Each structure stands twice: as C-alpha cells, then as structure tokens.
Amino acid sequence: GYDVKDYMAVNPQYGTMADFDQLIAECAKRNIKVILDLVFNHTSTSHPWFEDMLANPTSKYRNYYIHKDNSINYGTGGMGSFHAAYGEEGKIEYFGAFSPTMPDLNCANPAVKREFVKIMKFWLERGVAGFRFDAAKHIFDQNELPNGTANMTLNKDFWVELREAAIKIKPNVF
C-alpha cells in the first residue's frame, strides 16, 4: 500500500527480499530495468518514526512530521487537513494530505531528506535503476504551509535536490 511502514523492506503481499533480489537478477540477464514506486510524502501511522514520536515527547522523529501551529494562517485549496493523535504528551495535531492514517513528512527537515537519500541508496545498491515517486506534487501542499507560500517552487527545489543526490549514488539513475 501507500501507507509505508518500512522503506527498506518488501511488502509481504509481494514477496520477500530474496524474491526481489531474484527479480533484479533475472531482469538484469534480460537487460530489463526495474524502477521502484516510492512514497516520500507520508508514512503510515504504524511507521516506527511516527510511533516513536507519539511515545516519546523528546523523540528525534518529532520534527519528521508536520505539526499544527495555531499561530499560522494555513493556505487553502490543496489537499488534506490536520488530524489528532494522542501520545505521551497528550494531543498531537499532524498534517495528512490523504488520510488520518498517512501523516505527511516534514520534507523541509534536513534529517528527513537524509533519510530519503539513505532509502534511495539502499535500493539503488540492490540494483534498482530508478524510481517513480508517488504524490510528488504534495511534498509541500498548500494546506500544510502558511497562506501565500509558493508551494510549487518548494516542490521543484525539493525534487531537484533529491535527483542530484540520486545521481551522486548512481549517475544513470532514472
């Protein structure tokens, strides 16, 4: 599904990592390139980062997600809204463009970007030729940003930065 619980594992509905490695090997024999569908906009509420953020008020993952700031007048016209979850510190409001079970990641956070680079490196080193990124235009959604923020510029800059990082790992990446 699109509510990611582990970026570095094969969804059991599709098989095992051994199955994936065999797919890559068999495709390579036939000169077939494999691209992976990645979701960098959000995770599942069952993802370890989100669970740790709820359980631990000082979690390093707290700023991996977008939290509501009542002093901000958020934009409109995009997708999603803020949702509530309850953790050790009480009520936490986080943004989810698609569902309350899919909290959006804070893609402006350099630590989140470093995680994305690690994820791409993991799959590229396993033989993947490139990626298709789901929900690419929602990385910075109007509804999660202060009113008037140029979200399309933020989106473009984010993807240029990630593409440059992928090229450093694998120069001929798709």
Model-identified regions with their sequence ranges:
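Active-site and adjacent substrate-binding regions of carbohydrate-active enzymes
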Residues: 1-174
